[in-house]
């Protein structure tokens, strides 16, 4: 099921501490961006709509310490099924409660997106 607009708007509110978030439809979900830079996505990988935050080598451990899931999906490579992953982690459960709780995670995600842009 495609992610709904209300959830996308709510996620943008949660991420508002880093600036005005724009939600755009993307591959059946949503891309959340600031100034054209995508730093979060919303997707349903089979267990409902979820907010996924951009992570990098510097921030990955912080997400994993809270047992956040890595964005992983089934795909094919050379005609064989494989699990593929992207540099996004599910938002911590507690952070989904308020923009104040989400603020440090929003900064991490935006920082990861900025770092990836410089590469």
Residue ranges of model-derived segments:
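N-terminal first-folded block
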Residues: 2-38
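Noncatalytic, solvent-exposed loop/strand surfaces
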Residues: 6, 50-52, 87-89
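Amphipathic alpha-helical interface surfaces
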Residues: 7, 11, 55, 59-62, ...
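Short, intrinsically disordered, mixed-charge
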Residues: 13, 57-69, 107-115
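Residue-level signal for pocket-adjacent positions within structured domains
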Residues: 21, 58, 86, 91
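Short, conserved beta-strand/beta-arch hydrophobic-aromatic motifs that form part
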Residues: 26, 32-78, 82
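Well-ordered alpha/beta subsegment
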Residues: 89-119
């Amino acid at each position: 099921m495609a992610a709904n607009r209300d959830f996308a708007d709510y996620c943008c509110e949660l991420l508002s501490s880093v600036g005005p978030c724009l939600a755009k439809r993307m591959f059946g979900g949503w891309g959340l961006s600031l100034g054209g830079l995508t730093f979060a996505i919303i997707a349903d990988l089979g267990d409902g709509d979820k907010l996924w935050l951009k992570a990098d080598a510097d921030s990955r451990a912080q997400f994993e310490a809270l047992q956040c899931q890595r964005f992983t999906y089934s795909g094919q490579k050379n005609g064989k099924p494989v699990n593929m992953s992207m540099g996004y982690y599910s938002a911590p459960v507690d952070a989904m409660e308020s923009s104040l709780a989400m603020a440090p995670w929003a900064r991490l995600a935006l920082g990861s997106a900025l770092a990836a842009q410089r590469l």
